[in-house]
């Protein structure tokens, strides 16, 4: 990310991927309008904030699962409402469940 305000957001979400603050909330924290935030975010990352955050969480999940953390623990640590919501996101993103992903 090029914009220093977006770099701070990236650092904060790397430290706490479960943070559920909306794009509007992050825009407010950064002192931007939601529209400016969306434009800058799209320009710097090539994707909308929501998609980027999902990818960040997915990468964090892969690291934790590779370290043999339990699926339900990973789901809760990353801010998912339930294990099933996490598994559904994982399946949509990678085409398989977390358990099967690591046995392929």
Show which residues each predicted segment covers.
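Alpha-helical hinge/cap motifs
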Residues: 17, 42-48, 91, 95-96
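Terminal helix-turn-helix DNA-binding modules in bacterial transcription factors
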Residues: 20, 24, 43-83, 103-104
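Short hydrophobic/aromatic patch on the recognition helix
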Residues: 37, 41, 85-86, 90
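…primarily DNA-binding HTH/wHTH and HhH modules…
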Residues: 66-67, 88-104
């Amino acid at each position: 990310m090029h914009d220093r305000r977006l770099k701070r957001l990236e650092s904060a979400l790397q430290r706490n991927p479960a943070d559920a603050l909306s794009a509007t909330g992050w825009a407010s924290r950064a002192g931007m309008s939601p529209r400016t935030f969306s434009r800058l975010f799209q320009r710097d990352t090539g994707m909308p904030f929501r998609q980027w955050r999902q990818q960040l969480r997915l990468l964090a999940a892969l690291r934790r699962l590779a370290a043999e953390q339990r699926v339900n623990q990973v789901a809760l640590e990353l801010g998912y409402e339930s294990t099933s919501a996490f598994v559904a996101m994982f399946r949509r993103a990678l085409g398989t469940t977390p358990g099967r992903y690591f046995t392929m």
